[in-house]
Design a protein with these regions (language model features):
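N-terminal segments that cap or nucleate solenoid repeat domains
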Residues: 1-34, 96-115, 122, 188-207, ...
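Ankyrin-repeat intra-repeat helix-capping/turn positions
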Residues: 4, 40, 96, 127-130, ...
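Conserved ankyrin/ankyrin-like repeat signature
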Residues: 8, 43-44, 76, 100, ...
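Repeat-mediated protein-protein interaction surfaces in helical alpha-solenoids
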Residues: 11-20, 70-75, 162-167, 211-222, ...
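Ankyrin repeat domain, specifically the short helix-to-loop turn at the C-terminus of the second helix
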Residues: 13-21, 47-54, 79-85, 105-111, ...
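Ankyrin-repeat boundary/"N-cap" motif
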Residues: 21-39, 58-71, 86-93, 113-127, ...
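Ankyrin-repeat-protein effector appendages
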Residues: 76-94, 103, 159-188, 196, ...
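Ankyrin-repeat and related helical/solenoid repeat scaffolds used for protein-protein interactions
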Residues: 143, 337-345, 349-387
């Protein structure tokens, strides 16, 4: 299932018929049945339907279950429909089928407010202006928020860079009257709106995705910006990330020296950071403990240049960040060899080799092992394991990728 190997799945279910009664069980992430977990893969959908998967079985997620048609597109979606999948308003919006959506709304106007996966409304799933217009004409709430991530449709439509995802539709929703907070306005380059907000409250520049009002609020997870923008981004970071230099320039007069330093460091702009310190030599010493988290956040983002710069300037890599991990934990999980090497180049970084985080109780090597299975694709976890062991990390027990397991085995053999 994880490898999306349809041929292997067909062999398994052919040779082991005892697995078939569980085909609709919520065994996969977010309490999803197999068909929801693989709905984006036409070959996997075909195999699962062959063995009796229910094309209408939703995930059993607390905030709202995902129907297979909330995930599938193209050939996979058409196969599900042919197999008897019944589209609701969210699915019709997701599949960009305005005629189907119009017929559903004509039969029951309240469906414009129905809730789908994660508690999203049909507007959250929209893939075209035509569908957006249809929903708004039917009374859709532009600022309705989903249940799990507390976000509007426009906020869901970003995808980390200008023009990616449903960026144009996010712009269109705001043009139609959707509200835009400081993050969305920065991502869309709405300079006048940003300036107006900062005139009212300059402290908005301290806000960060994944923190404060954008943090986890159980049972709700992080605000959707954690995924659609990224973690630990300030409004200035967002404007730069989405390529809105004019919006960024308009923000700078409102920024404090500390905010400017954090921004320069996050950008890896050594020249600007050093210039700020020449003007205010005591700036790093004046940082609040939470300001030092910037180096850990950069490690979590795998930004080796920013990590190296902040360590050089005196930021503390022990400051807990994501899931209470230090900078070394975070860099190890992400698979950034360059970040790990930079951290280990400082005594304060090497001191973290045996530190266990307060959330999972793991060491940096343990985070490396876990990240090798669950972290970003292409991470250099085997190389990181070698670096950590060579620097003095104690051997960890736990699951890891084959490549990391090989490194651990070699180390055990060589240090008996």
């Amino acid at each position: 299932m994880q490898r999306r190997d349809a041929a292997a799945l067909r062999r398994l279910l052919t040779q082991h018929a005892e697995f078939r009664p569980f085909i609709n069980a919520p065994f996969f992430p977010f309490n999803a049945p197999a068909l929801v977990a693989c709905a984006g893969d036409a070959a996997m959908v075909e195999v699962l339907l062959e063995v009796g998967a229910d094309p209408n079985k939703r995930s059993e997620w607390w905030a709202g279950g995902f129907h297979p048609l909330h995930v599938a597109t193209g050939v996979a979606a058409e196969r599900l429909l042919a197999a008897g999948a019944v589209a609701d308003a969210c699915a019709a919006a997701h599949l960009d089928k305005p005629e189907l959506l119009a017929s559903l709304l004509a039969a029951d106007a309240s469906r414009v407010r129905e809730r789908g996966g994660d508690g999203q409304t049909p507007l959250h799933f929209a893939r075209s202006r035509r569908v957006i217009d249809l929903l708004l004409d039917a009374g859709a709430d532009l600022d309705a928020r989903d249940v799990d991530h507390r976000a509007t449709a426009a906020e869901w439509m970003l995808d980390r860079s200008r023009g990616a995802g449903r960026y144009d539709l996010a712009q269109y929703l705001v043009e139609r009257g959707a509200s835009a907070d400081i993050m969305l306005a920065s991502a869309l380059g709405r300079t006048d709106d940003v300036v107006a907000m900062l005139r009212r409250d300059p402290a908005l520049l301290d806000e960060q995705t994944g923190r404060g009002r954008y943090a986890e609020m159980p049972p709700s997870s992080y605000h959707i910006y954690f995924w659609t923008i990224g973690s630990s981004r300030s409004p200035m970071d967002v404007a730069a990330q989405f390529g809105h230099d004019d919006t960024l320039a308009a923000m700078l007069p409102f920024a404090t020296p500390v905010q400017r330093l954090r921004f320069a460091c996050r950008r890896g702009d050594a020249e600007r950071a050093r210039a700020l310190l020449r003007d205010e030599p005591g700036l790093v010493a004046s940082l609040a403990p939470n300001d030092h988290r910037a180096v850990t956040d950069a490690a979590w983002n795998g930004d080796a240049a920013a990590v190296a710069l902040m360590l050089e300037l005196g930021f503390d890599p022990a400051m807990p960040g994501h899931d209470a991990g230090t900078a070394l934990h975070c860099a190890a999980w992400q698979g950034s060899v360059a970040s790990v090497a930079a951290i280990l180049g400082y005594p304060a970084g090497r001191a973290l080799l045996t530190t266990r985080d307060a959330h999972h109780g793991g060491t940096p090597l343990g985070w490396c092992c876990h990240g090798s299975l669950h972290g970003p694709a292409g991470g250099e976890h085997a190389g990181i394991a070698r670096l950590l062991l060579a620097a003095g990390a104690a051997m960890e027990e736990g699951d890891a990728s084959d490549e990391v397991e090989e490194v651990l085995m070699e180390w055990r053999e060589g240090h008996r």
